[in-house]
C-alpha cells in the first residue's frame, strides 16, 4: 500500500490515511464545534436580551398600572366627596331661602324646617348614610352602635335602651356617630 495511490482504501480503525489528515480533520471538527458553541452562545445572548426586554416592558406596564390605579382611587375619593357635597346644596339653598323671609310666622318656619329636614335626610340616604335610632324599651344596648350616657332604674330588663338622646349615623356598616342613649340598670 502506497500513500500516493488514490485508489487505496483508508484504514478501518481511524478512517484517515495519514496523521496530517487526522490532525486536519480534528482541527476542522474543533473549529466546527467552536462555531456551533459560538452560534449557541449568540442565540442564548439574543434570547437573554429578549427576555430582559420583556421583563423591563412588563415591569414598566406594572408600574403604569399601579400609577393608574392610584390615580383612579384619588379621583374616586375626590368625586365621592364632590357628589356628597352636591347633594347637600339644595339643603343649603332651602336654609338660605328661609332666612331671607322677614315676616315668616312660626308655622311657616316649622313647615320650611320640616321640608329642609326631608331634603337633608334624602341627601343622606342617597349617599348611604343611615340613621342608628334604637327603639326605647325593645333594643338591647350595643356598644358598637350606642354610647351610654347614663344607666337609669327602669321597668325594662338590664341593658335595654330606655331613651334616645341623639340618633347616631352609619355609612357602609361603619359608625360615623353612635346613638346617645340611656340604658336600664340591672335590677
Curated annotation (Swiss-Prot):
The keyword Transcription regulation does not apply. Participates actively in the response to hyperosmotic and heat shock by preventing the aggregation of stress-denatured proteins, in association with DnaK and GrpE. It is the nucleotide exchange factor for DnaK and may function as a thermosensor. Unfolded proteins bind initially to DnaJ; upon interaction with the DnaJ-bound protein, DnaK hydrolyzes its bound ATP, resulting in the formation of a stable complex. GrpE releases ADP from DnaK; ATP binding to DnaK triggers the release of the substrate protein, thus completing the reaction cycle. Keywords: Chaperone, Cytoplasm, Stress response. This is Protein GrpE. It comes from Albidiferax ferrireducens (strain ATCC BAA-621 / DSM 15236 / T118) (Rhodoferax ferrireducens). Belongs to the GrpE family. One of its GO terms (molecular function) is adenyl-nucleotide exchange factor activity. It comes from the Bacteria. Homodimer. InterPro entries: GrpE (IPR000740), GrpE_coiled_coil (IPR013805), GrpE_head (IPR009012). One of its GO terms (biological process) is protein folding. It is found in: Cytoplasm. The keyword Glycoprotein does not apply.
Amino acid at each position: 500500500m502506497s500513500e500516493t495511490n488514490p485508489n487505496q482504501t483508508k484504514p478501518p480503525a481511524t478512517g484517515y490515511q495519514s496523521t496530517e489528515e487526522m490532525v486536519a480533520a480534528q482541527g476542522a471538527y474543533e473549529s466546527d464545534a467552536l462555531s456551533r458553541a459560538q452560534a449557541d452562545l449568540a442565540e442564548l445572548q439574543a434570547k437573554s436580551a429578549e427576555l430582559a426586554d420583556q421583563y423591563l416592558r412588563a415591569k414598566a406596564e406594572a408600574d403604569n398600572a399601579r400609577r393608574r390605579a392610584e390615580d383612579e382611587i384619588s379621583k374616586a375619593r375626590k368625586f365621592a366627596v364632590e357628589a356628597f357635597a352636591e347633594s347637600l346644596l339644595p339643603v343649603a339653598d332651602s336654609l338660605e331661602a328661609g332666612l331671607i323671609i322677614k315676616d315668616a310666622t312660626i308655622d311657616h318656619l316649622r313647615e320650611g324646617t320640616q321640608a329642609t329636614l326631608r331634603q337633608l335626610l334624602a341627601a343622606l340616604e342617597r349617599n348611604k348614610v343611615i340613621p342608628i335610632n334604637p327603639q326605647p324599651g325593645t333594643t338591647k344596648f350595643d356598644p358598637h352602635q350606642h354610647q351610654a350616657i347614663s344607666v337609669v332604674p327602669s321597668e325594662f330588663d338590664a341593658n335595654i335602651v330606655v331613651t334616645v338622646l341623639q340618633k347616631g349615623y352609619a355609612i357602609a356598616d361603619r359608625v360615623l356617630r353612635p346613638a346617645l342613649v340611656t340604658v336600664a340598670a340591672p335590677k
